[in-house]
């Protein structure tokens, strides 16, 4: 899937709709077409081809002008769906910010959907479509209970807002398919989940992230918590400035591929491909190949007959006793169950609860080599917080710089966060980490960052002034200034919360600065780098 146009509006193909495209680029003297080159490469190597087209366009003058922009957008979509052969997937997100005129656009999703069905009827429509839905985060983690048969009405339908509101569900809801909620729904949709995550901390290439490519252990954990949780996995790989995938990313992808092949190439379960129609409370035993060391079990339902398993129990038999290995809920297309390694003689799968009869298509037993995360530690700042002093009496503000992303400073109102660093600094940037739990209230979207020598006279630092996409990807945002700003005080001024609420929250804030010579009465200078915050596989932070 190629990002043919992102929110900046720049088109990677020679569109007739705007000059803001490869036509105006020195690359190939304006005669290049990135989309076509990728399409040809996909055909050459037997890969399916998909496009991402951002509906939000911060460059188009007609954005925010209703029908004018919808016609403009559908014309771009039409070019992509008619000039590049078969398109297997069309991917939209729901981003809907302001355009260059300060206005927001109301998208005509039904007209967009009709265009796709007319031009590429076999294409899968993802996220803002009705074939594949967004899992609700960009961390690479799916729900442990994931129903593909769901009550969530796809957002492209005009009735979606009313029906979803009536049920109290939205894309991030934990329960999208339990019996209770299905009984209250007017419609049920086959709407499987897609887990989206980047191999790097961000979605675009930055050389400073070359050492922060996700570790093999982290990628393997993502695989088990996405594909292994009845979801499909979309792994973002950003090309570098040469147009190629960076060698660090390539190396990790090869390691990841080898790990998955080695894990699943040998199935230690005998007759695991035997189909089984399982009613609630029924069990099936499987013999295990002699002396096999195992730690992973796979279950698949025949989804052509629906998704029906609600809960299951997995047991292993050795030394004359049955022992519980794992318990779980939904299965769907695929469920991967990890457990402590053992050498069982037999495996027993019990379907504790199912909707009518569950159609078990396949089971398997494997050994996944344990991995250790040796990835580089994420540095949230290099200015020690030990000298920081708060401006005010609210001591709970210290939660915002206690080196723990799980503690959060929360307050009513858009409250300015002000700190005295304890000495002068040449400040070069900062980091902002939003809350890492399900409560994102108070997450800062738009902001102003200022520095001061005396705490009274403030200078505004030149920044974009917004944490883009933080609503959908609430991870640490790093802001690096083009110049340094000398000051002893800094303040982060919230201008807008992600949902327009009057509240503020900060899980962690860090400051980057150039080390200064110590004064006569000072012995400490800012270390570069400083002691980083250590994060482990499975932590919410990237």
Predicted ranges, named:
Residues 195, 385-388, 404, 533:
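Bulky hydrophobic/aromatic "packing anchor" residues in well-ordered structure
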């Amino acid at each position: 899937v190629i990002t043919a146009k992102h929110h900046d509006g720049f088109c990677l193909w020679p569109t007739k709709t705007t000059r803001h495209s490869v036509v105006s680029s020195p690359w190939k003297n304006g005669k290049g077409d990135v989309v076509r080159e990728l399409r040809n490469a996909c055909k050459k190597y037997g890969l399916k081809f998909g496009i991402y087209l951002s509906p939000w366009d911060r460059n188009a003058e007609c954005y925010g002008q209703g029908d004018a922009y919808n016609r403009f957008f559908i014309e771009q979509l039409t070019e992509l769906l008619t000039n590049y052969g078969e398109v297997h997937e069309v991917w939209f997100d729901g981003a809907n910010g302001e355009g260059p005129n300060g206005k927001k656009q109301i998208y005509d999703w039904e007209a967009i959907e009709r265009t796709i069905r007319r031009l590429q009827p076999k294409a899968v429509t993802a996220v803002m479509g009705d074939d594949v839905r967004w899992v609700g985060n960009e961390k690479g983690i799916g729900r442990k209970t994931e129903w593909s048969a769901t009550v969530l009405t796809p957002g492209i339908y005009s009735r979606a807002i009313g029906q979803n509101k009536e049920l109290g569900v939205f894309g991030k809801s934990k329960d999208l398919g339990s019996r209770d909620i299905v009984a209250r729904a007017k419609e049920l949709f086959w709407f499987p989940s897609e887990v989206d995550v980047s191999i790097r901390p961000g979605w675009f290439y930055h050389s400073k992230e070359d050492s922060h490519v996700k570790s093999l252990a982290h990628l393997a954990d993502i695989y088990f918590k996405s594909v292994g949780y009845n979801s499909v996995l979309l792994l973002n790989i950003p090309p570098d400035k040469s147009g190629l995938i960076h060698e660090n990313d390539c190396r990790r992808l090869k390691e990841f591929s080898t790990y998955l092949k080695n894990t699943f190439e040998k199935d230690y379960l005998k007759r695991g491909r035997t189909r089984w129609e399982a009613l609630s409370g029924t069990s099936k035993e499987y013999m295990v190949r002699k002396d096999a060391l195992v730690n992973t079990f796979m279950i698949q339902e025949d989804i052509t007959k629906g998704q029906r398993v609600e809960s299951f129990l997995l047991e292993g038999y050795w030394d004359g006793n049955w022992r519980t290995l794992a318990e779980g809920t939904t299965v769907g297309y695929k469920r991967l169950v990890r457990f402590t390694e053992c050498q069982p003689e037999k495996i027993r799968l019990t379907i504790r609860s199912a909707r009518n009869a569950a159609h078990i298509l396949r089971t398997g037993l494997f050994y996944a080599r344990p991995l250790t995360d040796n990835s580089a530690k994420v540095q949230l700042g290099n200015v020690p917080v030990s000298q920081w002093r708060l401006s005010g009496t609210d001591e709970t503000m210290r939660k915002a710089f206690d080196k723990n992303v799980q503690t959060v400073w929360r307050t009513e109102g858009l409250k300015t966060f002000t700190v005295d660093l304890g000495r002068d600094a040449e400040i070069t940037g900062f980091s902002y980490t939003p809350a890492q739990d399900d409560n994102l209230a108070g997450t800062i979207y738009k902001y102003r960052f200022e520095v001061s020598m005396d705490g009274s006279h403030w200078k505004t630092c030149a920044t974009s002034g917004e944490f883009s996409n933080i609503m959908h990807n609430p991870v640490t945002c790093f802001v690096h200034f083009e110049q340094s700003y000398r000051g002893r005080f800094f303040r982060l001024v919230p201008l807008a919360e992600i949902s327009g609420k009057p509240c503020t929250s900060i899980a962690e804030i860090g400051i980057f600065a150039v080390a200064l010579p110590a004064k006569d009465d000072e012995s400490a200078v800012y270390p570069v780098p400083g002691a980083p915050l250590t994060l482990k596989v499975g932590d919410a932070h990237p």
